Amino acid sequence: MVVVPEFLIRRIYQKGSLKKIVSGVSLTLKNVLGPGFISGFNFVKINDVVFEPKDVKFITNGQEYNGTEVSEVNPIAFRLGQVGTLIMSGKDCLVDGVNKIFIEALNPEAGKVHLVAEDTSKPD
């Protein structure tokens, strides 16, 4: 199993991208590490609010993936330089000031990958 240092994973999150949208909240990820795959979203936590895979969508290269559809059998190719928008629906989670972001995703080579970041939100 490949181990990816946390400081590298943190670079995937695009600082300043966290924003409230009509259906919930969105943020942007950019693969700055190298070609790879996302084989699942276990959960996304913003502040104290947890979004399960059913509440998560990932949009990249014009394709929309529901969090429950992404798996080891049905992974998302996430190439170097590729950008994706992660949308979490159904819950209000943003606060004024700094918001804490924790994403637990799966990668076929590295297993569970944790992305931890902080950001202030933009209005919709």
Please report, for each region that a protein language model flagged, where it lies by residue.
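Terminal leader/tail segments of proteins
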Residues: 1-46, 50-124
